[in-house]
Amino acid sequence: GSNDFMRF
């Protein structure tokens, strides 16, 4: 998604 950078 557009917030994939929040996946740790």
From Swiss-Prot:
GO terms for cellular component: extracellular region. The modification Phenylalanine amide is found at F8. Keywords: Amidation, Neuropeptide, Secreted. The keyword Transcription does not apply. It is found in: Secreted. Transmembrane segments: none annotated. GO terms for biological process: neuropeptide signaling pathway. Its main location: secreted. Belongs to the FARP (FMRFamide related peptide) family. This is FMRFamide-7. It comes from Sarcophaga bullata (Grey flesh fly). The lineage of its organism: Eukaryota, Metazoa, Ecdysozoa, Arthropoda, Hexapoda.
